[in-house]
């Protein structure tokens, strides 16, 4: 039995159970998503978008799923302690694919802000969730998005009303927890109305040393003049596979910063599609990956300049050691009416060994003539002249290598607009390069 068939059979047998433990808003598109999954199947290397990562093979093993929504015997508020100096956040948890709401802290959110379980919030605010859920994540075009939509039962909703600004960042910690190999399907819906402002930090952790497979679909709507910063920090273990699809839509004069940082993982496959739908919208999109052993990190991005006078800046950097593999494919599309577009895309990569492999594919599609667009990609090794220069001045060879690698990724870290997080990332990256880090030293949740 192939991977698709086992999940087709599973859905057919358990559809009623899946719907029973979810909500009407999430159940409504479920049948269509399942039909799309039956038609599309899991992506393979035969598809251009997935040619650097064979996603289908990760679904072949047997995984446990919590379709009955059984309680997880862990209180994350008792075992998690984020001690990043000078960083004050509103802290929340998702355990596997369920929002943890049994010991919520005292709310620090302004009036009108909605944050919590997607399932519960959809029951309380059905028209709001219905307006946005599934409107960016097109199940007819991507097998993973279709699969996630068919099986997801809960998730997270963040809604910020017009002209409301969150003073404190929201910190969402995704915890993978299981005694057997486990599959989770996470869903995130983020809506900022016109003039709203928010910052969000999402941290991925795995508590147990079993095989985890996590699919994730994130939809982000950013209204006119709204400002949103989203930081994703992945620190799981080498038996974890994460397949994440993010869809972002920006209206006029909105400003978004996306920063995805992979410090430790097994396999990460991240797709991000950004639609600049209103004039004056700006996206600053950064990513960093540090990989060693047989780790694999693949980022596939697209930025659609659909209207005039928009700006996009994209910067991705990889440092690959041992036999690790990295991939970056980035498309910038400038449509015929999108005059006065300003776009810059850069991908720089450092292979610390001859065995490490990096695939890079920057792309520009420009159908307007009054634009300023550039792209570039480099793959190289450490600068031998710089190493020689540093050793001549008494710096040991290993220390010189570490200094050069740290300087290489520092440009991405410096885009972070939370000073406390930026300072902690400098420390974590240094420890990662020294081989001293396989989990966040700023918390006590991972084994």
What are these regions (language model features)?
Residues 1-217, 227:
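Short, low-to-moderate order helix/coil transition modules at the start of elongated helical scaffolds
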Residues 124-388, 392-395, 409, 413-447:
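Conserved beta-strand/loop scaffold segments within soluble protein domains that form the structured core
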């Amino acid at each position: 039995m192939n991977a698709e068939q086992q999940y087709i059979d599973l859905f057919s047998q358990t559809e009623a159970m899946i719907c029973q433990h979810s909500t009407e808003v999430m159940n409504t598109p479920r049948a269509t998503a399942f039909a799309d999954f039956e038609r599309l199947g899991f992506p393979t290397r035969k598809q251009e978008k997935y040619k650097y990562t064979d996603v289908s093979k990760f679904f072949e093993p047997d995984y446990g799923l919590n379709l009955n929504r059984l309680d997880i015997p862990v209180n994350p508020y008792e075992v998690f302690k984020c001690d990043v100096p000078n960083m004050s956040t509103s802290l929340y948890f998702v355990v596997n694919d369920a929002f943890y709401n049994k010991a919520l802290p005292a709310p620090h959110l302004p009036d009108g802000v909605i944050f919590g379980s997607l399932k519960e919030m959809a029951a309380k605010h059905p028209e709001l969730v219905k307006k946005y859920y599934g409107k960016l994540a097109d199940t007819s075009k991507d097998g993973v998005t279709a699969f996630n939509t068919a099986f997801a039962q809960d998730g997270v909703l963040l809604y910020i009303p017009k002209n409301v600004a969150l003073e404190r960042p929201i910190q969402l910690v995704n915890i993978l927890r299981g005694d057997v190999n486990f599959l989770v399907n996470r869903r995130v819906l983020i809506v900022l109305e016109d003039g709203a402002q928010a910052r969000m930090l999402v941290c991925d952790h795995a508590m147990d040393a079993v095989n985890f497979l996590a699919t994730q679909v994130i939809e982000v709507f950013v209204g006119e003049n709204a400002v949103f910063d989203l930081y994703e920090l992945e620190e799981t273990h080498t038996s974890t596979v994460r397949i994440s699809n993010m869809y972002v839509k920006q209206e006029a004069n909105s400003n978004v910063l996306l920063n995805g940082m992979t410090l430790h993982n097994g396999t990460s496959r991240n797709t991000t599609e950004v639609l600049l739908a209103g004039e004056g919208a700006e996206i600053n999109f950064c990513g960093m990956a540090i990989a060693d052993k047989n780790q694999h990190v693949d980022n596939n991005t697209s930025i659609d300049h659909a209207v005039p006078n928009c700006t996009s800046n994209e910067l991705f950097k990889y440092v690959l050691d041992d036999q690790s593999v990295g991939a970056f494919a980035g498309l910038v599309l400038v449509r015929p009416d999108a005059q006065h577009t300003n776009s810059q895309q850069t991908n720089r990569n450092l292979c610390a060994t001859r065995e490490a492999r990096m695939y890079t594919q920057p792309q520009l599609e420009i159908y307007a003539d009054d634009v300023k667009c550039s792209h570039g990609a480099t793959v190289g090794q450490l600068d031998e002249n710089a190493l020689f220069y540093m050793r001549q001045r008494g710096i040991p060879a290993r220390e010189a290598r570490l200094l050069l690698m740290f300087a290489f990724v520092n440009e991405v870290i410096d885009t972070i607009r939370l000073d406390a997080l930026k300072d902690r990332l400098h420390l974590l990256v240094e420890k990662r390069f020294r081989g001293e880090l396989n989990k966040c030293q700023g918390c006590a949740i991972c084994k």
